[in-house]
A protein has these predicted regions:
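Glycine-rich loop/linker segments at domain edges
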Residues: 16-111
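Alpha-helical support elements that line or immediately flank enzyme active sites
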Residues: 1, 51-70, 96-132, 137-145, ...
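Acidic, glycine-rich active-site loops and adjacent beta-strand->loop/helix elements
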Residues: 2-12, 38-42, 133-137, 181-183
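Non-catalytic terminal/interface segments that mediate subunit docking, oligomerization
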Residues: 167-191
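Short Pro/Gly-enriched beta-strand edge/turn motifs at strand-loop
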Residues: 2-7, 54, 58, 170-179
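Acyl-CoA/ACP chain-elongation machinery
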Residues: 147-149
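Generic secondary-structure signature for well-ordered alpha-helical cores
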Residues: 26-30, 36, 80, 114-122, ...
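Active-site-adjacent elements of ketosynthase-type condensing enzymes
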Residues: 8-19, 151-153, 158
Length: 191
């Protein structure tokens, strides 16, 4: 068993990231497209570049720097762009200490979902549930992601109910909700 001290000596810190997101809506407020641009240090590029898969135009990319961008929300046309942060790569060796890519990717995504709900003047829980349709690719597959987006939607419903979502709050307080899944879509964890 590795202690936290051993872990800190063995691994490198997760890179900071900068993310830019945009969402398109039709005249009825339905989501028709989404872009997510993620600039971060690329651990695989620094440590083992020969393991990087090829993306568009045969350009290599580090999937560990954008894990989580292939989320369970139905957003129409979906574009994800991974940008290697050369400054981060040259300044320190980016790694996975204190979480892998979904740690920062899903934080940005969930914050953005709140912003989109606010723009549409929709309740953030209702907006999430509207996008977690479990249709097509978001239906999930056996044996790893059975239920897909419907399982994540169920987590949102249960969390909102247990938190008293929509109820009266004391003055000067607020309530937020975010959801996520494991490192990859085929992991069986929804939180």
């Amino acid at each position: 068993v590795m202690t936290r001290e051993d872990d800190v000596k063995f691994d490198s810190v997760r890179s900071p990231s900068v993310q830019k997101m945009r969402m398109a809506f039709d005249k009825d407020g339905n989501v028709t497209g989404m872009e997510q641009h993620v600039a971060a240090g690329w651990p695989t590029e620094v440590m083992a570049p020969y393991f990087m898969p090829k993306g568009e135009k045969d350009a290599p990319f580090d999937p560990f720097a954008i894990n989580g961008a292939n989320h369970w929300y139905t957003v129409g046309a979906h574009k994800v762009r991974a940008i290697s942060n050369d400054l981060a790569n040259a300044t320190f060796r980016p790694g996975w200490l204190r979480s892998v890519g979904p740690g920062f990717t899903n934080w940005a995504l969930e914050s953005f979902i709140d912003e989109a709900a606010h723009k549409l003047k929709m309740d953030p829980v209702a907006f999430r549930l509207k996008l977690l349709t479990a249709e097509g690719a978001n239906a999930g597959t056996a044996p790893n992601s059975v239920g897909g987006a419907s399982r994540q939607a169920n987590v949102v419903k249960i969390a909102a109910e247990k938190a008293g979502w929509g109820g009266q709050l004391p003055a000067g307080t607020g309530l937020g909700l975010a959801t996520s899944f494991g490192q990859e879509r085929d992991m069986t964890t929804w939180v």
